[in-house]
Amino acid sequence: MATVKGLLKGLRYITQIFDEEKDKDMQIGFPTDVKHVAHIGSDGPATNVPSWMGDFKPQENENGQVVSRADANNNQIGEGVGLQELLPPTDKPKHKKTRRKSETVSQNGSPPRRNSSASASDMQPKNTRRHHRSRHGSIDSSNDPSVRRRRVVSVTTNDMEGSYPLSDSSTHSRKSTSRHRKPKGSGGGELSMKKTKGKTENPIVESVDTCNDNNISDKE
């Protein structure tokens, strides 16, 4: 029994050791013991800096003083003045607007006069747009079937108008020739027969007259 009690005491001791280790692992300090990251370094270089902040070195001047944020901003602004002088100014259009306003004010409410070159340059894109539209309009109209029909109708009417006087003159000439040709065609035979009959009768009459004259002369 003594041995069993000794073993139990040993086990309790071992379990207490593990429990203490577990308690040490699970211990959490008070909130005041933990510093927020934003407050690190605010106390100055005298305070102990955490180990993970050892890689970061504070910016120092030539005199060895720590540079604050405000001083750093001021120094950056002072150094940037030289760069701004080297860079080209970006406020040129604003000056132009002020000049235009001053011109309008100096003319006592009269509208500003535009230069001839400026007016010509302003009018050119408008004219080009109109020409462009007219060209596109002509192209589009040529593709439309209705416009094609109108063109065909206009062309045919012009052709007919041009051909009407010729047709009238041709019809008149044809009528006149037909009138002249009708007696030659259908009635031509009758006239020719009459003429031939007249020619045949005339020599008979002449022969009769000559015979009568001869008889009268013989009687005398």
From Swiss-Prot:
Keywords: Cytoplasm, Growth regulation
PROSITE patterns: CRIB
Residue ranges with Low complexity bias: 108-121
Primary localisation category: cytoplasm
Segments of this protein annotated with the region Disordered: 39-220
Compartments where found: Cytoplasm
Tissue expression summary: Expressed in flowers and pollen.
Biased composition (Polar residues): 61-77, 209-220
GO CC list: cytoplasm
Source superkingdom: Eukaryota
Basic residues bias: start-end ranges: 127-136, 172-184
Keyword Cytoplasm: yes
Effect of H39D: Loss of interaction with ARAC11/ROP1
CDD domains reported for this sequence: CRIB
GO biological process annotation, one example: pollen tube growth
CRIB domain ranges (all copies): 28-41
Quaternary state and interactors: Interacts with ARAC11/ROP1.
Further remark: Over-expression of RIC3 in tobacco germinating pollen induces depolarized pollen tube growth.
Function comment: Functions as a downstream effector of Rho-related GTP binding proteins of the 'Rho of Plants' (ROPs) family. Participates in the propagation of ROP GTPase signals in specific cellular responses. Functions as a downstream effector of ARAC11/ROP1 to activate calcium signaling that leads to F-actin disassembly associated with exocytosis in the tip of the growing pollen tube. Counteracts the ARAC11/ROP1-RIC4 pathway, which promotes apical F-actin assembly associated with vesicle accumulation, to control actin dynamics and pollen tube apical growth.
Protein name: CRIB domain-containing protein RIC3
Naturally occurring in which organism (per UniProt): Arabidopsis thaliana (Mouse-ear cress)
